[in-house]
Amino acid sequence: MFMKAPVRVAVTGAAGQISYSLLFRIASGDMLGKDQPVILQLLEITPALEALNGVIMELEDCAFPLVAGITGTDDANVAFKDADYALLVGARPRGPGMERKDLLEANAAIFSAQGKAINDNASKGIKVLVVGNPANTNALIAQRNAPDIDPRQFTAMTRLDHNRAMAQLANKLGKTVNDVKKMLIWGNHSSTQYPDLHHCEVDGKVAIDQVEQDWYENDYIPTVQQRGAAIIKARGASSAASAANAAVDHMRSWALGTDEGDWVSMGIYSDGSYGIQEGLIYSFPCTCKNGDWTIVQGLEVNDFSRGKMQATEQELAEERDAVSHLLP
């Protein structure tokens, strides 16, 4: 089988829970294809290097044919050197008594440094996905610190919300997720996100016409918005495997393209489409082709949707303003 030249994939927080589900998927070819060798460049904080070494030992012990090399480091300049893809998974979790503003500031320091390291060391064509929360604003901070990289190359993950929304809808209608097309998450990866069923199709028919409005507004939307919290309550830990799966899905769609007649939700640099402030990292419906994304244009937005879209935009603007003194 013809093998392509290896690509370099940087992953941060590489000894953490999400990465433990993620790295083996990348190494097996789930993300970039079964014909694409990868060199894994794994970043951790110094105290976690020993744990990272254990993960690297396990990756070696899988003897994945597509793995052309693995490095582990606590130096961002080394981790991002010539990287073609970067998955920024590591972030400061919210500790007891921490306000959201404290969390934003703690992460701003991390993502500023990583943005600079990407700018100075990575391939200029790098594709960056931020998974670590607050993902949209962390992506914005990294992007602003990488002036030599096209802002379109920094994205935030709302694919987990997209997948959650598909599963909830399929369950409600007694269908499978294969029957669901054109799911759409607008806005922030937070409890203000807006899962929009007005353009979504199930079995080729508009989804919103197949459900009661009351269920949609008072059951479905809050369930999707608060799914992460529900998993923490049930499992005693945050969603790791499903987050890793969504990261693989996001990157695969971006790198290899979306299916004909369907789209995906991606947190991307707003160009002002749908009246959303330019420069925010906001989730839009996107199609992907040849390694590039395009916002799906011309969707009708009713008053209900507009209100929801503006509420999540407002939250993103507030997050940006809270860290604006730290942005270049």
From Swiss-Prot:
Q: What is its EC number?
A: 1.1.1.37
Q: Which PROSITE patterns match?
A: MDH (PS00068)
**Keywords in alphabetical order:** NAD, Oxidoreductase, Tricarboxylic acid cycle
Active-site residues per Swiss-Prot or TrEMBL entry = H189 (proton acceptor)
Residue numbers binding NAD(+): G13, A14, A15, G16, Q17, I18, S19, N107, Q114, V131, G132, N133
- Taxonomically, which superkingdom? Bacteria
Q: Name one GO molecular function term.
A: L-malate dehydrogenase (NAD+) activity
Which residue ranges run through the membrane?
A: none
Q: Which reaction does it catalyse?
A: (S)-malate + NAD(+) = oxaloacetate + NADH + H(+)
List the Pfam families hit by this protein, alphabetically.
Ldh_1_C (PF02866), Ldh_1_N (PF00056)
Task: Tell me the InterPro entries matching this sequence.
Answer: L-lactate/malate_DH (IPR001557), Lactate/malate_DH_C (IPR022383), Lactate/malate_DH_N (IPR001236), Lactate_DH/Glyco_Ohase_4_C (IPR015955), Malate_DH_AS (IPR001252), Malate_DH_type2 (IPR010945), NAD(P)-bd_dom_sf (IPR036291)
Q: Which residues bind substrate?
A: R94, R100, N133, R164
The Gene Ontology biological process terms listed for this entry are: malate metabolic process; tricarboxylic acid cycle
Chain's role:
Catalyzes the reversible oxidation of malate to oxaloacetate.
Instruction: Describe the family membership recorded for this protein in Swiss-Prot or TrEMBL.
Output: Belongs to the LDH/MDH superfamily. MDH type 2 family.
Q: Which NCBIfam families match?
A: MalateDH-SF1 (TIGR01759), PRK05442.1 (NF003916)
The name this protein carries in UniProt is Malate dehydrogenase
- Organism of provenance: Alcanivorax borkumensis (strain ATCC 700651 / DSM 11573 / NCIMB 13689 / SK2)
